[in-house]
């Protein structure tokens, strides 16, 4: 039980550090966490945490490149329907386009990428509110389109 609480404390501290928007490298984050008493933290652990929480590098108010957490627009949980974030799904002969609520495209794209080739998705490119999906096989794009639509309970 103590290990879980310690992990929860680490996550809270990690998020608080990123909210400061002043750490431009993973080694700076490691040093900050070590200063907070997490002596066993290392760069690979920080790298995994940055990836897990979707941290990105962006410019802060001083125009410095720093790590920060994406804006939490009611970050979906396992219980909240992602389908509410998908506004439109369309396609042509070679690509599927998904339109999302602002800020949701990267989250949805990550989900689609995790499904991958078995469901006909070769890869995705996500902006703020638009995702381009490249199907594994353009001759089966309708099947991939149906898969994407069914994932989000999207009906025309």
From Swiss-Prot:
Lineage: Bacteria, Pseudomonadati, Pseudomonadota, Gammaproteobacteria, Alteromonadales
Purpose: Regulates arginine biosynthesis genes.
Keyword Membrane: no
Annotated protein name in UniProt: Arginine repressor
Domain of life, source organism: Bacteria
Alphabetical GO biological process terms: L-arginine biosynthetic process; protein complex oligomerization; regulation of arginine biosynthetic process
Key words, A-Z: Amino-acid biosynthesis, Arginine biosynthesis, Cytoplasm, DNA-binding, Repressor, Transcription, Transcription regulation
Principal cellular location given in the protein's record: cytoplasm
Name of encoding gene: argR
Family of the protein in this entry: Belongs to the ArgR family.
Entry GO terms, CC: cytoplasm
GO molecular function, one term: DNA binding
Localization in the cell: Cytoplasm
Taxonomic source organism: Shewanella sediminis (strain HAW-EB3)
Pfam families reported in the protein's UniProt record: Arg_repressor, Arg_repressor_C
Biological pathway: Amino-acid biosynthesis; L-arginine biosynthesis [regulation]
